[in-house]
Design a protein with these regions (language model features):
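Conserved mid-core segment of classical short-chain dehydrogenase/reductases
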Residues: 79-94, 135-138
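Rossmann-fold cofactor-recognition segment
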Residues: 45-58
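Conserved glycine-rich cofactor-binding loop
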Residues: 14-15
Length: 239
C-alpha cells in the first residue's frame, strides 16, 4: 500500500518509532495522520491530527473510532517495556494490557473502517517475539502473544482485503532501549524501512540491521511455511 493520500492512525506517536512514523508518513504524502498519544501532541503540519488515546482505555478507543471514521492504515505502535523476571504478576498484566490487548482492542474497533477501505494493520513488534530476552521477560511474553495475534488476524482478514503486517524490530535508538549498550538503528531509518515493507506488501518486516539478518531464514523457514499452511484452515472453513 502506498501512503499517498491515505488516512493513517499511529498509536504511541509522541516519541521513538511512533514519532518517526508520523514524520515519514507526512514525507510520503499521507492525507491525514492521526497521532494517538495519552497526552495530546502538538505538530506544525496541519495534516497531523492530535488524538488523546490510551490503548488500555475502552472509552477512548471507541471515541477515536467514531471521530476518525474512514481509515486506511492502523499502526499499533504504543508499547511498554520494563525490566523484570516474571516474579510479579502485575508486571506481566501491565505488559499484556498495552502490548497485546491494546493491539487487539484497537484492531477490533477499526476493523469495519479498514475492511471498507481495504486497508492495512501494521503491528510494531520485536524480534523478542521469536526469541525472548529474559531481562525483559514480560515484554518478551507480550510481544510473542502479539505476534501470534498478528498472524491470526492475518489469516482471517486476508479474505476481506485487509493486509496485516508484523514489524519485528531489533535494537532501535528509542527510550525503551536507552539502557542497552549495543549498536542501534536510528528511528528514522526504521520508519523508512517499515513503510518500505508495507509498500512492498511484506507480511513480516525486519526494519534494522540486526533483525534484517534474520529475515531470509525466517521467510524461507519451516515455521513461516506452517503459518501459511495453518491459515488454509480458515479458507477451507469459509469455502
Amino acid at each position: 500500500m502506498k501512503l499517498e493520500n491515505k488516512v493513517i492512525l499511529v498509536t504511541g506517536a509522541n516519541r521513538g518509532i511512533g514519532r518517526a512514523l508520523v514524520e515519514e508518513a507526512l514525507k510520503r504524502g499521507a492525507k491525514r495522520v492521526y497521532a494517538g498519544t495519552r497526552v495530546p501532541l502538538t505538530h506544525h503540519d496541519p495534516r497531523v491530527m492530535p488524538l488523546t488515546l490510551d490503548v488500555t482505555n475502552a472509552d477512548q478507543i471507541e471515541k477515536a473510532a467514531t471521530e476518525i471514521g474512514s481509515l486506511d492504515m492502523l499502526i499499533n505502535n504504543a508499547g511498554v517495556a520494563l525490566y523484570d523476571d516474571l516474579s510479579d504478576p502485575a508486571m506481566l498484566e501491565r505488559h499484556l494490557a498495552v502490548n497485546f490487548y491494546g493491539i487487539y482492542s484497537l484492531s477490533q474497533a477499526f476493523l469495519p473502517a479498514l475492511i471498507q477501505r481495504r486497508g492495512a494493520i501494521v503491528n510494531i513488534l520485536s524480534i523478542v517475539a521469536l526469541a525472548p530476552l529474559p531481562i525483559i521477560a514480560s515484554y518478551s511474553v507480550s510481544k510473542a502473544a502479539a505476534f501470534s495475534l498478528t498472524q491470526s488476524f492475518r489469516a482471517y482478514l486476508t479474505g476481506k482485503g485487509v493486509r496485516v503486517h508484523a514489524v519485528l524490530t531489533g535494537p532501535v535508538d528509542t527510550d525503551m532501549n536507552r539502557g542497552l549498550d549495543i549498536p542501534k538503528a536510528s528511528r528514522e531509518s526504521a520508519a523508512q524501512a517499515i513503510f518500505g515493507g508495507v509498500e512492498n506488501e511484506e507480511e513480516d518486516i525486519f526494519p534494522d540491521p540486526v533483525s534484517a539478518s534474520m529475515a531470509e531464514s525466517w521467510r524461507g523457514g519451516a515455521v513461516k511455511a506452517m503459518e501459511r499452511q495453518n491459515a488454509q484452515f480458515v479458507a477451507t472453513d469459509r469455502a
